[in-house]
A protein has these predicted regions:
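Positively charged, helix-rich recognition surfaces that bind polyanionic ligands
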Residues: 1-216
């Protein structure tokens, strides 16, 4: 789970400061040896942790991916199906956050996450902003601009990329074309947590809770 807290410029909704970046990993919690009740209990505690962050930073809104996942056979084995269909408990988390938002007076905005991981990694990903945080930044940007026409996708930006990327991707019309091109070339674009975990400024493993927190 990637979290980021942003402060947007009142005069330019595409400009913002990143105030806080955090990853909460639940790998141990997702193991088959963990009971559903234990898993749900710890997920609810994570919701309270998020709620505390919102109050600490005086946030007015929480931004989430608008996802609908139907139970199905993904064709990758029972363990993978279980992780996709059962373990995530997304509805539990969303409903708890909505309950807390009603109590404490902040808004919840859900947005279409199309290409948010790809765009997030390309625009915001770096050695101190791993994949899931980069994605959360793009989701937050979309949510902040949700009701403004033409703000769903930012213009393609290549200036910060290396020359190989610039030359190969120059002239593409949209992010979908760029994603398909990168996928076809099998280029790595994700800043994976495990590759940059040593850059976390703070980390703590909660053994009983089976959760690890990283702050970047």
């Amino acid at each position: 789970m990637g979290l980021s807290i942003l402060e947007f410029d009142k005069n330019n909704s595409e400009k913002f400061k990143i105030l806080h970046k955090e990853v909460i990993t639940t790998f141990e919690l997702n193991k088959t040896s963990v009971s559903n009740n234990k898993r749900k209990y710890e997920l609810i505690k994570i919701c309270y942790h998020v709620d505390k962050l919102l109050k600490t930073w005086k946030c007015s809104r929480i931004c989430l991916e608008e996802l609908t996942i139907n139970s199905s056979d993904k064709g990758n084995g029972k363990t993978f199906n279980r992780l996709c269909n059962n373990v995530w408990c997304r509805n539990l988390v969303i409903n708890k956050l909505k309950m807390l938002s009603n109590i404490h007076g902040y808004f919840i905005t859900e947005v279409n996450p199309a290409y948010s991981s790809f765009i997030g990694n390309i625009l915001y990903g770096n050695e101190s902003t791993p994949d899931m945080i980069a994605s959360s930044i793009e989701v937050a940007r979309r949510a902040y601009n949700k009701f403004k026409k033409g703000h769903f996708y930012l213009p393609i930006q290549l200036d910060h990329l290396n020359e190989q990327w610039k030359q190969t991707l120059n002239g593409l019309n949209n992010w979908k074309e760029m994603f398909n091109k990168v996928k076809k070339l099998k280029w790595k674009y994700r800043f994976l947590l495990l590759d940059y975990i040593q850059n976390a400024v703070f980390s703590k493993t909660y053994i009983k809770q089976k959760v690890t927190l990283y702050t970047f």
